Regions:
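Peripheral/terminal regions associated with large enzymatic or DNA-binding modules
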Residues: 1-66, 70-309
């Protein structure tokens, strides 16, 4: 079934636009199965309405969650079905992303996951640009949300995410992922793109979030979590254990990865840190000739742009 959830306007000034949205929904024809339109009787806000839709996974077994400013590929359903088959029973995963962002959301630098033998990578952050959940994945999040305090998991999350306003749920999801050590699986080629229309978070249109859509692929290589090299933490940094699979330059050391130089001191608790920050006494150094940055460590590029200290 297709479920369209329309929030109740919180102020009278939005009532006319809200009525137009409801009329558009009622006029929509869905030939693929049942269509249900839910007009919320009281304002839930963006977060409440999104979580209402996510909870549909517990009713139907799984849900594809799309906000209204997304354009989807014709292949999104094939990817969602294949990803659910591959990952639906893995308790280490909190959800499946339909979107593949082009940038690091904390530093706004380009983000390029290292290639491996799969069409996916893993990241300890969520996305607002299209997700898929199983009933078990949403139930786990719901149970955590009911028990968690406002600071649960916060020590392991970037300050930018902790400072997000109440009408943004990415910070809450980041705390959940950090606290429970769960990940989202992401496609390397995006099945959604954000049109960047004005709304709750943007006063005018933006193309910043747009990415190319994969419109042709029919079969996706859903590499299991344990076999993947491209596994990233909540700071877009490659997990040390995965980096050690690609090079022996750091193997045997207890180190944190901070190549984007965005981790606060509270996250740098390992014996060593691999970083692009200036260091006075580095045990090893690497250049910065290659992209992504970890490629310099893998190739042993000489230089002093990256430090193990």
């Amino acid at each position: 079934p297709l479920l369209i959830a329309i929030d109740c306007p919180a102020v009278e000034a939005h009532a006319t636009a809200n009525a137009a949205v409801a009329a558009t929904a009622r006029a929509f024809r869905w030939p693929h199965g049942p269509l249900e339109i839910v007009a919320q009787p009281a304002p839930l806000g963006l977060v409440g309405n999104v979580f209402f839709c996510g909870a549909a996974a517990e009713t139907y077994g799984a849900v594809v969650l799309l906000e209204d400013d997304l354009l989807v590929s014709a292949r999104f359903h094939a990817y969602a079905r294949q990803a659910l088959t591959a990952y639906g029973d893995d308790p280490r995963l909190a959800g499946i992303s339909l979107n593949s962002p082009w940038f690091n959301g904390l530093t706004h630098q380009p983000f390029v996951p290292l290639p491996d033998d799969g069409d996916v990578y893993y990241l300890q952050l969520s996305t607002p640009h299209g997700q898929v959940y199983t009933a078990a994945q949403w139930a786990a999040f719901r149970a955590w949300l009911a028990a968690a305090g406002p600071q649960t998991g916060a020590v392991a999350v970037h300050d930018l995410l902790l400072a997000l306003p109440a009408d943004d749920w990415l910070g809450t999801k980041a705390r959940y992922l950090a606290d429970t050590d769960r990940y989202y699986v992401y496609p390397r080629e995006s099945l959604t793109t954000a049109t960047g229309e004005p709304g709750t978070h943007f006063a005018r249109v933006t193309s910043f979030f747009q990415v190319p859509l994969q419109e042709r692929r029919r079969d996706f290589r859903c590499l299991p979590f344990d076999e993947a090299v491209a596994v990233y933490d909540g700071f877009y940094e490659l997990q040390p254990e995965r980096l050690d699979r690609l090079t022996d330059h750091l193997r045997g050391r207890d180190y944190a990865v901070d190549l984007y130089a965005s981790k606060p001191a509270r996250r740098l608790t390992a014996e060593y840190v691999l970083t692009t920050r200036p260091c006075r006494a580095a045990e090893a150094t690497f250049g910065r000739a290659l992209w992504p940055l970890e490629a310099n460590v893998i190739a042993g590029v000489p230089g002093r742009g990256i430090h193990l200290a």
